Amino acid sequence: MRENTGKVVLVGAGPGDTGLLTLKGEKYIKQADCLVYDRLSSPEFLSMAKAGCELIYVGKENHNHVMKQDAINELLYEKSKYHELVVRLKGGDPYVFGRGGEEALYLVDRNVEVEVVPGVSSSVAALAAAGIPITHRGIAKGFQVITAHSRKDEEADIDYSLLTDETITCVFLMGLAHVKSIAAGLMKAGRRADTPAAVISNGTLAAQRKCIGTLADIGEKIEEAKLTSPAIIVVGDVVSLNDRLDFFEKRPLFGRKITVPYIKTNELIAKLQQLGADITPVKTGTGAGCSSAPEGSP
């Protein structure tokens, strides 16, 4: 045990695409003595860790928490007693519905040095990858980001009367199971039934899928599309721009699943990913490598 506690850095991993991880976030991941990570989209994040780094999976998704938040808070504190640098790697941005504030306060109250490295939020990045600008002159002058998920794994109690301005884009996180009720709530509050709406699944990843409709029919459309979490709901006239601005799904290999041998500096993997391919890297032989699923994942 260290005489003094080490430093804990909360790093936002971004929306899933490793290319959207910040340079500062990557630096801390590479320096970490202990990496405490959530359910991440790519094993590449873990492959950045140095040899000997302690990897601890505390994955959290709806209805399936490997470790409760209170236990995660205590874990970070305990690990800071043994390691000089502990990195808490969180999807998106630590302070955008990531409970990063709770973790930081818990540590600060125990005199642990804390730093926060912001991440690219999926509330903006997933929209961009789907061809939807969150604001657009003459269409949307602002945006609201709302969690559709409560502390008890139920639908959040949303005051839809605050979301009726048609010049404001509404983005709902963690609400795939509640699309119909969200659409109904917005229409009841006064939003037009023909207001464009979209649901984006696995935004910024090669597995990205989107469903476009209106408030009146988006609930039925996503049932037919069978989209999966994580997903984002977008409501507003900016959704109508997606056909013209969608660069992501128009890449030549988008949606193609390709399995390749894992090599840490494999330029072929990088090139295929740039072209939109969904790459599954696999270990070959006994050398160091990275499996297709994060170590410690269920």
Model-predicted regions and their roles:
Residues 1-18, 23-120, 224, 231, ...:
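Class I S-adenosyl-L-methionine
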Residues 2, 6-8, 82-86, 150-271, ...:
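A contiguous loop/helix-start segment that scaffolds small-molecule binding in enzyme catalytic cores
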Residues 17, 93-95, 100-166:
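Class I SAM-dependent methyltransferase SAM-binding "motif I" and its flanking Rossmann-like core
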Residues 43-44, 63-65, 121-125, 142-145, ...:
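Short gly/pro/ser/thr-enriched loop/turn and capping motifs at secondary-structure boundaries
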Residues 70-75, 129-132, 159-160, 211-217, ...:
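Short, surface-exposed amphipathic charged segments that create phosphate/polyanion-binding patches used
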Residues 78-80, 133-145, 215-226, 297-298:
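A polyampholytic, Gly/Pro-enriched intrinsically disordered region
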